[in-house]
Structure formats: structure tokens, C-alpha cells
């Protein structure tokens, strides 16, 4: 069975669960391919495709798997550093408006920060500034390394939050699904 998924989804969600699937179904040989392209089932040797979206693909059967919230996350070091260095002029990260003094990390294909800031009723933060990444896993790694605050999808940040590699500076989430 060949499964095509987005790279970040493979790294952050699917691969950590693959071992349990293999234990339950040892007779199924699984091949994971990562791609950001739409799959052409007539040409590509793929059995299942998992993509992020609304699931409306003409001529294909699709299932809605789960909702994802957008959640601001950063390194615990960045959050502690902002607090401990405040007396030396470092930017605090106590309120959403404090994001204007921090680097925002972006997914280059989506404008999630603008949506999240609107949902949080926050003005005065430039939602377009900061580096953008072509892959969510790279963006989240930048956040883990203390390079800024990322807006992560809940399914992709779950394990990093549990392991303490990422923290939520704010409890406000946004679900962009219609």
C-alpha cells in the first residue's frame, strides 16, 4: 500500500504512528511517499493520498479526517528568555500584542497569522513580517530552535508540546475550517 502525504504530516503525525499500524497489520507492506503535488491516480503509483484541505476533489472519494486548530507556539527558551531578559530590554511575550516585537514564522503557502490575529481580535501586529517556510516541519523546527513564534497546526505540534520542545504562549486557538 503506497500512501502519499505532505512532508510535515509524514514527519510529525504519520511516521510516529506507523509502528503501531505495522504491529496491528504486519501483512500490509506500507510505502510512504511525500509530495506537495496533487496526485494523478492514473499516472502515479499511489493507493491513498492524504492532503490538508476541504476534501472536495472531483472524481475522487474523500473523507474528512479531523479538524485542526491553529496554535501559536515557541521554544520554552524563547518564552523564558523574554521573561528573564525583560530588565535588559528584551521583548516580553505576555500578551498577544507583544507579538509585534517578536519574529513571526510563516508557512509560505498560507496566510495563517492574519487569520489568527483577526480571530484573536488583535490589531497592531504586522502579520506579514518574518521568514516563511515551504514546509511546516521546517517552520516548527525554527520555532523549536528559538527563532520566533510559529502558528502550528494542532496535529503537527502535539508531540513537540508533550515533549516540551514547544510551548503555547497563549491559549487562544483558531479553527480555519468552514
Where are these regions (language model features)?
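Central regulatory/effector-binding core of bacterial HTH transcription factors
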Residues: 1-58
Amino acid at each position: 500500500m503506497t500512501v502519499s502525504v505532505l512532508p510535515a504530516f509524514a514527519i510529525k503525525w504519520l511516521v510516529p504512528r506507523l509502528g503501531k499500524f505495522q504491529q496491528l497489520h504486519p501483512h500490509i507492506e506500507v510505502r510512504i511517499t511525500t509530495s506537495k503535488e496533487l496526485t494523478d491516480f492514473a499516472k502515479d503509483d499511489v493507493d491513498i493520498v492524504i492532503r490538508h484541505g476541504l476534501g472536495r476533489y472531483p472524481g475522487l472519494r474523500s473523507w474528512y479526517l479531523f479538524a485542526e486548530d491553529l496554535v501559536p507556539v515557541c521554544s520554552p527558551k524563547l518564552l523564558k528568555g523574554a521573561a528573564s531578559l525583560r530588565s535588559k530590554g528584551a521583548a516580553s511575550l505576555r500578551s498577544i500584542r507583544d507579538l509585534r516585537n517578536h519574529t513571526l514564522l510563516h508557512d509560505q503557502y498560507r496566510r495563517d497569522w492574519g487569520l489568527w490575529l483577526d480571530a484573536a481580535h488583535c490589531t497592531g501586529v504586522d502579520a506579514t513580517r518574518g521568514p516563511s517556510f515551504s514546509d511546516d516541519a521546517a517552520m516548527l523546527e525554527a520555532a523549536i530552535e528559538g527563532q520566533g513564534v510559529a502558528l502550528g497546526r494542532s496535529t503537527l505540534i502535539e508531540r513537540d508540546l508533550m515533549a516540551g520542545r514547544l510551548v503555547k504562549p497563549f491559549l487562544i486557538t483558531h479553527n480555519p475550517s468552514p
